Amino acid sequence: MSEITSTDTAAGATAASTGSHEGQVKRVDFWFDPVCPWAWMTSRWMLEVERVRSVHTVFHVMSLGLLNHSDDPELLIGVRAAIGVRESYGDERVRDFYTAIGTRFHLGKQPKTVDTVKAALRECGMDEAIADQATTTLWDDLLSTSHNEGMKPVGTDVGTPVIHINGTALFGPVISPAPKGEDAGNLFDGFEKVTAYPGFFELKRTRTVGPIFD
């Protein structure tokens, strides 16, 4: 899988705006927990969408630990570190950390530990001390605020991914594998149309495959 950085997506947004879907770059806000493989799949789709549509994704943190009232360290270290990255480097660097840590968690099957988080931070040129701080409650209030901002519009009976677009929000889409090229753009077009109707709540079928990381 070809990974995409913040520099790549800025270039992609410019390229997309000159193509057949010319127009102002649309902001999409995406809430994720680094441990969730389904959020990972959807995030890779959104980065592909940025290649073919005038879209820019801003990544935010929600917590499955908070949602499920769990204090499991494996559920907390990734989200705490992501908040630490946001506080230290700004919103736009969160995507780079997410790619680095998600690649390790989901493709590399690496453990959800301080050492794994440090390796992801090191890859991004970020302060490895964030990983140690992520074992504490230092950023928990900020994590809770980010979580609530993402989840309040969709409720507590869904998880991640959550996407906010055009003043509304939905859980999903849950996809496997993540579509590429114009297929990714077409799925986004449909998703955007669904979000435009305020009375839309749910469209679902049973999953027959797990996350396919291609």
Locations of regions flagged by a protein language model:
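Short metal-coordination and nucleic-acid-contact micro-motifs, chiefly zinc-binding Cys/His arrays
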Residues: Q24, F32, G159
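Conserved acidic functional residues
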Residues: D29, D33-V35, V162-H164
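C-terminal cap of thioredoxin/glutaredoxin-like
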Residues: V114-D214
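Structural alpha/beta surface segment adjacent to cysteine/selenocysteine redox centers
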Residues: W31-P34, W40-K118, G190-V194, E202-R205, ...
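N-terminal acidic, proline/glycine-rich, low-complexity intrinsically disordered segments
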Residues: M1-T14
